[in-house]
């Protein structure tokens, strides 16, 4: 068979082709290959590196797929709310009208006191994001506002915005 140094050289080459290894992981495997006493140890380290590389690739693929799915939900929700006026429907929101303009700016009219519905947003733009914090649900955010509203398109021409309460609005064009 091959000499240990041949096996080691082949292992280095194989290791350098594993593109899904983190830099520190590759470094660690390289170090372990350098000090491996025999061909069996070299093979074992290489097998471990391959497993890590494949796991990293699978994780990266899953993350990319999740991001694509999240983006799709965000885009669909954004399309449903872009250029519409939300008219307060639930009791605490009657008298409140929020317009989400197609250019991503907004207007709000608050004709009620006290206001226990959504408050005056901060910042001049709105957007829909989907992230892990809200378990993959679409969220309405305003550019300078810490408050996020989980969005549920109810399928009956209404939308619910959820923060400390669930605020229901009728969608009108």
Regions found by a protein language model. Give the residues of each.
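N-terminal helix-cap/turn-to-beta initiation motif at the start of protein domains
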Residues: 69-87, 97-103
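Acidic, low-complexity intrinsically disordered regions
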Residues: 153-154
